Every structure is written in C-alpha cells, then in structure tokens.
C-alpha cells in the first residue's frame, strides 16, 4: 500500500465536517466544538419530541461518526482529533444541541478515553436535569475474556449497527429506557474480528510500515493498535477468512461471546477499514458468506458491505456478526428502517432539505460557551510563582516529548507526547495573555483543568482534567487563606480519590497512575515534594516490567512491549510524561 499523503495544515477535521454538511442537507455544524447535529432534532425545530441519540469519538473512522447523523439514526455527534476522544465540553455541546424532553441516549465505543469523557458529559447533563442513559459498545473478540476482564471488549463494527438500529427504535417513538435496551441487545449479541496487511498512515505523522512485506495481522484495532498475532506468508482471502471465522464462532470458553445456531436470523457486516478496493471487499464478502453457509450452516438474513467504521487508509477488513434472533424484538425491522445518514446504504432527502444549501452556505450554529466558576475560593496564590512553576513543567514535557511519542508509537497510537505538548502550548498562551486566574489557587487550577480538557483530548486529557477539577475543589474546601504545601498535599489526596471513580486503573496496571499515586502517597506521608517527585519517577520506571491491563496498550501483544529490553523494558508513556511534568514543577518550586 502507499504510505504517501497529501500535505495539510493539520486541521482537517473541522473542514471535513463542514464538507459533509455541505453535501448532506439537514445537518448543522458547531465549528468550535466540532459537533454535527441533525437540524430537525434541535429543541427549537418545532418537530415532535423523540429520544435523541448522541455519539462520537476520535476522527479517522469516517464515515463513523458524523456520517451516521440523520433521520432514523443519530441526532448529534462530537468529533475529537484523529484517534483522540472529544472533550467533555464538546460532548456536552452535542447533548445540548439535540436536548429532548424524552431524554438522550449516549452511544460510546468502549475505549478508556471515550468512556471517561462521555461518562463525565452524561453526569453533567444529569446534574443539569436532563434524562440521560449511556450504552458502551464492545464487540471485539480478538482479546479473550480473561485478558479483557478489566477493560472489556473494544468497540468496533457493531457501533454502526447500534447507531442504525437504536436510531430507528427512537424514530418509532420508544421511550429512553426502551431505546437503551434495544441498543444494549445489539451490543450483547454482536461479535467482530478484523485483519489487515499493515497499519494506517496518520495525517501529519511520518509514514512507517509496521508489518513486513509478506506479513499480515489478525485482531487489528481501529487506532493502529497491534493485533492478536502476525503471520506470514500472505494468505488468500479464502485462507484468511477461514482463520477469522473460528474466532467469531468457535465455542472456545475464553472467546465465545455470542452463540450462533443454524436457522437463526444473522446480520453480516463486512467492513472496509479504509484501504481495500471495492472489488476486493465484495470478493471477501462473498467468500465469508460461502464459508458461513458451508461450514457453519449460517445463512445471513441481511448482508451489508462497505466502509462503515474505518482506520483511515487501513488495508484490511472486519467481519461483524449480529444474532438478530437472540437480540429479539423488532431488530430486523429497525435495521431495515430507512435513514438519511450518508454512512448507510439508503438515503433520502426532500427538495425542502436541499433549499437550505441553495444559498451557498453550510448551516452553522454558535458554540456552547464554557461557564467558568466566578466565585473566588479565598485561597491566595502568588501569580508569578504559580506561572513560573507551570512553565517549568511545560518545559520538561517539551524535553521528553520525542521519547514519550516513541514509546507510545510502540505501545499505543503514538499521540501521548504530542497531546501533552498541546496542553502545554495552550497553557503557555494563556499565561502570556494573562487569562489564567492564578492569584486564586482554586480558580487557577480550575482554569487549567478547562484548558487541558479543551486542548489535550484523548484519555490522558480526560484523566488530567478530572484530577485537576477535583484538586481545585480540594483546595477550595480547605478553608486556608493561602496555598501552602500542606494545602496541596491534602487536596492531592482528595483528587486521587475522585479520579478513581472514573478509571479502573490502579498501581501496577501500567498507566500514568503508576507515577501519580506514588507522588500523592509520598506527600501524604510527609516526605516532601522532592521525594514525591522521585517516587513518581521510580513508579514510571517500574512500568517497564509490567503488563498493561487497561487502555489501548492492553490490546498490544507482549512481544511488542518488550522491544526496549535494552533499556530495561518499555515504560508507560503517560507515566513517563507525568513524572517529567512533576519534576519540573517541584524543581521550579525550589525543592
């Protein structure tokens, strides 16, 4: 496959959303928040209320997610940067754009960053008085039940089926709990496996071939995660399918997620991961159907083929099977229900819809404004000292970014270092423009939390934002007159407890928690900031010998994580980045 790419200015997501709306009447774009919503679903549209469906996630999977906004499917989505979750603010903006008195169902793929951000947005919506349910999609079978017990199955092809079927259920007037039940039944009765000839090329990143010229990989994710195993030489499509179907259908105790019996109603989806020709994909679909019929006596009731949820230009395909009989009810009726979503096979637009675009402008809507807490905490801080400490931490991040990015290229999707740098650049700009309220300790930390959430995205952005928000609340609740080491120590412990409500990661799971908890515990034990920073560094170093249990690295083969044995093993990139940040803070503070 070609790894060449056209040059871009780095901002391709927002123009894509505008281009999609330009060719699909009835869609409105909130540019700043990268939200696309169905104009007819807005609260002021005058249309009868129905349960609204909100989804989203990282970009790079097109037509998912924005391509499934339409009548009979999703009502709104929030788009993150490539392979990075949208922020909580973006998601909340999408929820507000289609707020309904009948409630909102949030559909999210089962990835750590997505779960954190969409979960936090759901909680904020509930706190604001909205009725909200959340369904997490996990249909991957490449990771067995034992290894995936903590993180669950990755969300892959079934995400599209949930969008379509739950959207139709909502259009039929079902209540929120009923629509959520339909969505969950699709998740519970779907399985997916994918295979590829290589990893995809991420715009703006240096292309690199991960697999050898004669290698292929089974179990590939949609974020460039390594698969379950690699093999060579290259097989025929028929040989490859014969290796993939047993992972979906064999009754192995560790991998048998859904039972399929002859004569049951089964939906087959053959998904192009972005780089296969339509000719090859159609051929693969026929081979899959033949083997299902001949080897397993399964005759698909519905078959759909195309690019539904991609990994940019990934040269591979995925097989998704849904047991519609076990899912029950009107699943096939909802599957067949027409939709205007461009990512589906069936589209319909009225002349009235097209009139909106006849004026030459894409409908846009104003961004939802961030509501900052204006109530001071009374905990004073020295502005210049606070800014100096922040800038020192940012400088440390810039220093270690190349190494962190390299580590994450092996263990994840390669964005950890650049994500941290993005957060640092936003804070540097804010300090330069004096927009951070650093003279008030709690307000300053709250401002930092908002900036981190907006600028970083991804899993780390969500974790940092949650921790900082709770840290600010801990400072506010301290009742102290000024920010001291003792104030920070107590608030840090409160913040860690709050963070644990939103992540399953704990020490030993090979995440940034392996650096954060030792730092907090050292402070709590009275060892002082310098000893705490050293504890964070030591914790990050210990991850070199750990197996990942949560996050994207948990899906990567162990041999990939052992590529740096000469250094003592591959450390967790997030832990390394956090340890460097804390070292910069502590050094600038004079410890």
Swiss-Prot record:
One GO MF term attached to the UniProt entry: ATP binding
Start and end residues of each DhaK domain: 8-344
Record EC number: 2.7.1.28, 2.7.1.29
Residues involved in ATP binding: 413-416, 459-460, 511-512, 572-574
Location of region: Disordered: 40-59
Enzyme category, top tier: transferase
Domain (DhaL): residue spans on this chain: 384-587
Annotated active site: 223 (tele-hemiaminal-histidine intermediate)
Cellular component GO terms held in the UniProt record: cytosol
Transmembrane portions of the chain: none
Record Pfam families: Dak1, Dak2
GO term, biological process aspect, one: glycerol to glycerone phosphate metabolic process
Sequence positions that bind substrate: 58-61, 109, 114
Coiled coil segments of this chain: none
Catalytic activity: dihydroxyacetone + ATP = dihydroxyacetone phosphate + ADP + H(+); D-glyceraldehyde + ATP = D-glyceraldehyde 3-phosphate + ADP + H(+)
Pathway in which this enzyme or protein is active: Polyol metabolism; glycerol fermentation; glycerone phosphate from glycerol (oxidative route): step 2/2
Keyword tags: ATP-binding, Glycerol metabolism, Kinase, Nucleotide-binding, Transferase
Family of this protein: Belongs to the dihydroxyacetone kinase (DAK) family.
Role summary: Catalyzes both the phosphorylation of dihydroxyacetone and of glyceraldehyde.
Name of protein: Dihydroxyacetone kinase 2
Species of the source: Saccharomyces cerevisiae (strain ATCC 204508 / S288c)
């Amino acid at each position: 496959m070609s790894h060449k790419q056209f040059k871009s200015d780095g901002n391709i997501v927002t123009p894509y959303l505008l281009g999609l709306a330009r060719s699909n009447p009835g869609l409105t774009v909130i540019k700043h928040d990268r939200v696309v919503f169905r104009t007819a679903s807005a609260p002021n549209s005058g249309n009868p209320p129905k349960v609204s469906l909100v989804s989203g996630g990282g970009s790079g999977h097109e037509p998912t997610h924005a391509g499934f906004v339409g009548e009979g499917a999703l009502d709104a989505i929030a788009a993150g940067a490539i392979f990075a979750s949208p922020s909580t603010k973006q998601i909340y903006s999408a929820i507000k754009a289609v707020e309904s008195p009948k409630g909102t169902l949030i559909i999210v793929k089962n990835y750590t960053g997505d779960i954190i951000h969409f979960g936090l947005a759901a909680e904020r919506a509930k706190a604001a008085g909205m009725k909200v349910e959340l369904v997490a999609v996990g249909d991957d079978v490449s990771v067995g039940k034992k290894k995936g017990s903590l993180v669950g199955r990755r969300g892959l092809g079934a995400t599209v089926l949930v969008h379509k079927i739950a959207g139709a259920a909502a259009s039929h007037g079902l209540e929120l709990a009923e629509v959520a039940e339909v969505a969950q039944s699709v998740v519970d009765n779907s399985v997916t496996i994918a295979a590829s000839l290589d990893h995809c090329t991420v715009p703006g990143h240096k292309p690199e071939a991960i697999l050898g010229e004669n290698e292929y990989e089974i179990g590939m994710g949609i974020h460039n995660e390594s698969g379950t195993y690699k093999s060579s030489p290259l097989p025929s499509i028929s040989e490859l399918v014969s290796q993939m179907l047993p992972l979906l259908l064999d009754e192995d105790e560790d991998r048998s997620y859904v039972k399929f019996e002859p004569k049951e109603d089964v939906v087959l989806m053959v998904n192009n991961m972005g780089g296969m020709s339509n000719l090859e994909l159609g051929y693969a679909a026929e081979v899959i159907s033949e083997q299902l019929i001949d080897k397993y006596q399964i005759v698909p009731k519905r078959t759909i083929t195309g690019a539904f949820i991609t990994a940019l230009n990934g040269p591979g395909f995925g097989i998704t099977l849904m047991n519609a009989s076990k899912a029950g009810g009107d699943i096939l009726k909802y599957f067949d229900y027409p939709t205007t979503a461009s990512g589906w096979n069936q589209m319909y637009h009225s002349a009235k819809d097209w009139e909106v675009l006849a004026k030459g402008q894409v409908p846009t809507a104003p961004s939802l404004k961030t509501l900052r807490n204006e109530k001071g905490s009374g905990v004073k801080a020295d502005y210049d000292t606070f800014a100096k400490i922040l800038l020192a931490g940012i400088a440390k991040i810039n220093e270690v970014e190349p190494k962190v990015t390299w580590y994450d290229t092996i263990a994840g999707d390669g964005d950890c270092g650049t994500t941290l740098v993005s957060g640092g650049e936003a804070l540097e700009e804010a300090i330069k423009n004096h927009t951070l309220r650093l003279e008030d300790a709690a307000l300053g930390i709250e401002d930092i939390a908002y900036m981190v959430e907006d600028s970083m995205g991804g899993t780390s952005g969500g974790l940092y934002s949650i921790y900082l928000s709770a840290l600010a609340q801990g400072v506010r609740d301290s009742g102290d007159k000024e920010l001291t080491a003792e104030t920070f120590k107590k608030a840090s412990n409160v913040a860690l407890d709050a963070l644990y409500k939103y992540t399953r990661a704990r020490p030993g799971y090979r995440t940034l928690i392996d650096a954060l908890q030792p730092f907090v515990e050292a402070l709590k034990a009275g060892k002082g900031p310098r000893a705490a920073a050293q504890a964070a560094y030591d914790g990050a170093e210990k991850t070199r010998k750990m197996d990942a249990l949560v996050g994207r690295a948990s899906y990567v083969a162990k041999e990939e994580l052992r590529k740096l044995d000469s250094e003592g093993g591959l450390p967790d990139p997030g832990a390394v980045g956090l340890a460097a940040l804390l070292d910069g803070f502590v050094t600038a503070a004079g410890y």
